[in-house]
Amino acid sequence: MIELRDVTFTYRQADPTPASEAPGVRGIDLTVSDGRCVLVCGASGCGKTTITRLANGLAPAFFPGELSGQVLIDGEDCAGLESWQVAERVGSVFQNPRTQFFNVDSTGEVAFTLESMGWPEEKIRERTDATISELGLSTLADRSIFSLSGGQRQRIAYASAWAAHPRNLVLDEPTGNLDLESIRALRGYLLDAKRKGAAILVTEHRLWWLLDVVDEVVVMAGGGIAQRLAPVEFAALDSCGLAGLGLRTTDIREVRATSPRGTGSSPEPFLQARGLRARYGRQEVLHGVDLEVRSGETVALTGGNGAGKSTLARVLCGLHRASAGTIRMRGGAAFVKDRNRASAIVFQHVGHQLFANSVQAEVTLGLPKARVPSAEHTQEILDCLGLAQLAGRHPATLSGGQKQRLAIAACIASGKSLLILDEPTSGLDLVGMRAVAGLVRELAAAGHALLVITHDAEFVAACCQRVIRLAEGRVATDIPVYEDDLVWNLMTASREPTSRG
């Protein structure tokens, strides 16, 4: 059981002045009983991640700040427990799983929790093998962590958290990089954990998969609890009711395309790839990919975790060498340096590409003087993405969704012709997703070519004109998006339609 009793927490940065205090949460009363699941949702920056850090003991132990009230785990006050004692009681999956890994191989990572708890070696092997089998991860066993996709890493992180069968689970946006099949699998894992008596606290923006999992929905705003909903009340909310709370859809199968196919895209491709192959070490990841993206067009690149989407993106922008095939831009051969100059990319985990000391400085960091946007244009970009009020903040103090928007802002400010966005809406709330979709539409209208790697049907519906699905390193389908299409069907299609109704 996890209990927060009248908890208020404010982060304190290294600078001890009052102005350095970052927002946290206030007056939180929350109980997650054994065998129950509580969903905490709300806008980016509302305090969801802080709730998870309090529940698993990371705040204030590793995230310093001022704490009042009580946090209890299985009836014991966290203030009187050592960090290892909390870790034995609570299994955690972080927003970015890379920040919780201690091993370089997947099987070792699953076993790590058991080793830390001092289990006998034979029992560790038995439970590790059983967990990998139980969660259907045999194809990911004994793999280098660095060779795994973002979604595959999240699945390994959950396996590590669940290996010891903890009485409590805390998951911070666990589906951020998961494909649709893996999300459905995670739903099954959580239902099983509930049946086994685990108390589960989960924060999410993508809500559709949780409808029959949660026992209570807590909506947060401005660091406090704004509303509590029973599952039946939550399920009864229509799109307007959800939007009023800043929440995303609960019925992904009914999401329809709202962005009509544009007529402003160029008839000739800006980017053309033929027969692309790429390797990681001895393993071939791409097996002869053919792809085109036109100026003025936004293409969604979808597919299962490990299908090769991120590798393809890195090859196209010159960050990873193809082992075979050709890439052309504007009809001419495009070598690595040409692709570097013409493209900008937002990575799956944006924390690896934020370097400046302020949000404002990050937007123009590294740009040559001739290409630095005016102060007015920079302000417009920040305004559009809801970051203007955070211009003076250090990027490290931002929430996951705010960091995502900042990386997108820097990508836009670069003015490059080809923009590649890898999971740009992971960690984004409804408002943030719509803001990014609006900017993508504007960029396409201005003549940019955009390739968006995504599992987000709402985002595809709002701004994409084509859906390309990769499967096992090959293009499985390439389907145009027409207004009012059911996007779920396009993203999961096993073959291309022969006609349009």
Spans of features found by a protein language model:
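The feature captures the beta-strand-to-loop junction immediately N-terminal to the Walker
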Residues: 41-43, 302-304
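Helix-to-loop junction immediately C-terminal to a conserved catalytic motif
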Residues: 56, 317
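Conserved ABC ATPase "signature" region
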Residues: 122-140, 373-390
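Conserved ABC ATPase signature
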Residues: 144-148, 152, 394-398, 402
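Hydrophobic anchor residue at the start of the ABC signature
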Residues: 158, 408-409
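ABC ATPase C-loop
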Residues: 161-162, 412
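Catalytic Walker B motif of ABC-type/P-loop ATPase nucleotide-binding domains
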Residues: 169-173, 419-422
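H-loop/switch region of ABC-family ATPase nucleotide-binding domains
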Residues: 204-205, 454-455
